[in-house]
């Protein structure tokens, strides 16, 4: 009997949604989506237990010394240099257009999907349905993205059930959520489509556009290594990525930088756990901007350090003329 009950439960968890999820009418009103479209989407969606299992084990729960080696690897650096070389013209144009460094764009695509090779195998509709209506911790966010997916699929003329992405519903080379896809994806090669799945030119332009819209500051380092001395570190640390302190506050507490900042500079003290104890950094505006892509400070630091490693390795390579397919008439 127990086995039969278990089998029935598993079938229920993977079965197509038969009951309209609660709050659908309110969601339709909030997101300005016809209720009938949300109902049709929900009727095609399936509840996926593997999505709930995966989101309960985020990589960002690891300490820094275990998280960093997942992303800062010789292979990812080498392939980042190769990606940069193959798309040098597009990356140069993105830099000029959006004032966002090529190294950052490459690092984002490298961490998110290993330069487009690992874009996710989960049906996006199912993932967002599962998390939007069966994951109370962040149901509001994912329900909104479920509605945004319906709008996006209609606008781009995509079949809802064929879209694949991450367990959290992120899509394409840059892993954009549906709302980000709608607002920040760009047609960077001028072919009339915003294709972040198979078109690296659009993916590069879209990542750059995202950071420009979130106020990336050209030439400003995201973080600075800090010396803490006798500073009361425990009273200065906090979990949120927002820049809730000023450099004057940290300096008064005893924090030191190689080059002090202006006293009113917004900052945040970070502690990253190494195997032999914490290392300390002072985060600045651009670090916060990276956390708009992913709120985890570990993610933001991995992006920054990978971008620096790729940039250093790229500078050592013989420079050749950019590949012709990346050139778009009238864009350079």
Regions found by a protein language model. Give the residues of each.
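Cell-wall glycan-active module
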Residues: 1-3, 7-143, 148-164, 169, ...
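Functionally critical loop-and-helix segments that line ligand-binding/catalytic clefts
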Residues: 175
